[in-house]
Amino acid sequence: MKDPLLFTPGPLITSATVKAAMQRDIGSRDADFIELLASIRSELLRIAGVSRDQGYEAVLMQGSGTFGLESVISSVIPPEGRFVVLANGAYGERMAAIAERLGISTRLARWPENESPDPARVQHLIEEEPAATHVAIVHCETTTGILNPIDEIAHIVKAAGREFIVDAMSSFGGVPIDLNKLEIDYVISSPNKCLESVPGFSFVLARRAVLETTKDCARSVSLDLFAQWEGLERNGQFRFTPPTHALLAFARALEELREEGGVSARAARYRANHEALRTGMNELGFAEYLPGERQSNIITAFRYPDDPNFRFEDFYHYLRARGFVIYPGKLSRAHCFRIGTIGRINEQDVRDLVAAIGRYARLKPSYVSATI
């Protein structure tokens, strides 16, 4: 049976060659595997536009992207530290929840889900928090698809002398990030988003100068970021069992990113996908949740039709039966569904999805009148 097309923010559609890369076994302590890990770490820094010579390190961490986030939060904020989270969606809220569970002094600053953190308010907030040592934000908040202004926020945070943590799960590899210019201290991401690979681990790009200050700070053994980096530096290996097959797939996915033309070329494909989706859905009468200037090309939230007969479950299963998978909404105050435009998909795939949505609409007379 043919796999469906995944219009999701990840895990997502991967190429046949990325999947094929997992069809072999490799020893986790083998010299070839250690060489593979070293090449992956170097390539991640290259994608971010930095290098070890510029004082940056790439640390691979077993587990999902959230494991990488928890690794950073639990490892780099000292016992006397204070953590400020700028949140406008579920994933910002998750960072604060992690910190609070760990007993870290935390301030959660909330914005509406359809608004980005306002730099002026962030400036005031940091001035109100002289004890704050670390500030964090989600770059692309996949609750809505909003792209937060990390350039402006980074300038404010660094000018105040605080360390800056960026959750770039859904943006790294698909949205250019100038790590060196912005002086971001920690960027966390995962393979199964814009890098178009499979899940199984996360990675952290860190400024070495700040990472070196975190020895013995971790609140976890398995998620100790400094110890993980130290182990990779000492013998090139994970401290615990690495996801060997996922790393083989990732190495191939990184090659394919380079072959495509790098982050700018991939971003252009995602932009074209998003434009095809936006145009097609607008023609069907669907309203986007976000204003265009705040919308990323990663995932888009659409409001439910103004029709009491609309049932997302019916809509979802109709599309799934025809080979398309979309996401339900995750908003706290609005009924939406979400459609991703990343992964190994193109404009024609998006048009095919929109055509299927149009056919569904025509099957529902009241739905058609409400949307078209």
Model region roles, listed by residue range:
Residues 1-31:
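N-terminal "arm"/small-domain region of PLP-dependent enzymes with the aminotransferase-like
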Residues 13, 192-279:
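Active-site C-terminal subdomain of aminotransferase-like
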Residues 21-71, 75, 90, 94-100:
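Conserved N-terminal alpha-helix of the aminotransferase class I/II PLP-enzyme fold
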Residues 67, 75-131:
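PLP-dependent aminotransferase-like
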Residues 117-173, 186:
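Active-site phosphate-binding strand-loop segment of PLP-dependent enzymes
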Residues 180-192:
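Conserved active-site segment immediately N-terminal to the catalytic lysine
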Residues 287-318:
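Conserved PLP-binding catalytic core of the aspartate aminotransferase-like
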Residues 335-372:
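PLP-dependent enzyme catalytic core of the Aspartate aminotransferase-like
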